[in-house]
From Swiss-Prot:
PANTHER family: UPF0234 PROTEIN YAJQ (PTHR30476:SF0). The lineage of its organism: Bacteria, Pseudomonadati, Pseudomonadota, Gammaproteobacteria, Alteromonadales. One of its GO terms (cellular component) is cytosol. This is Nucleotide-binding protein Sden_0770. It holds the Pfam family DUF520. The keyword Nucleotide-binding applies. Nucleotide-binding protein. Belongs to the YajQ family. Keywords: Nucleotide-binding. SUPFAM superfamilies: YajQ-like. GO terms for molecular function: nucleotide binding.
Length: 161
């Protein structure tokens, strides 16, 4: 019986590469010349620091562009609403979602069951395991998960026949 896992993960190497590319672009951008701005990366949290709140938002856009160039889905980013002002710099934390939250997993399982496909979906920790009789049904579930607007990107692994 074919089965697969639906997960939501960010590749840490690609994230690091996107941050490095953002730093390079930051050093060459004309609007950041002579300004204090930096991008720090620690595991799945990126801290953006700049002299102005507007510049912090520009750093978010730079990071988002570099992520999409490195095939990391920017919808996995969670950007703080307000920049923290300390001294003469503003800092903004960007965290990346790892794993599927239980509420999102429940919504995904409900969508799969409402689609009337002949598959079974079960929540296993931060993944969703889908099993079915036909491979085509699993591919339809893949399409359904990618098209769903749940605010989180999904990847598929452990595809077994």
């Amino acid at each position: 019986m074919p089965s697969m896992d639906i997960v939501s993960e960010v590749n840490e190497e690609e994230l690091r590469n996107a941050v490095e590319n953002s730093r390079r672009e930051l050093s060459s951008r004309f609007d950041f010349r002579g300004k204090e701005a930096e991008i720090e990366h620690k595991e799945f949290i990126v801290t953006l620091k700049a002299e102005d709140d507007f510049q912090c938002r520009q750093l978010v856009d730079i990071l988002r562009i570099q992520l999409s160039k490195r095939d990391v889905d920017p919808s996995s980013m969670e950007v703080d609403d307000k920049a923290i002002h300390s001294g003469k710099t503003f800092s903004l934390k960007v965290s990346f979602k790892q794993g599927i939250d239980s509420l999102v997993a429940k919504k995904l399982v409900k969508q799969i069951k409402d689609s009337k496909l002949k598959v079974q979906a079960a929540i296993q920790g931060d993944t969703v395991r889908v099993t079915g009789k036909k491979r085509d049904d699993l591919q339809a579930v893949m399409r359904l998960a990618k098209e769903s607007e749940l605010g989180q990107p999904f990847q598929f692994n452990n595809f077994r026949d």
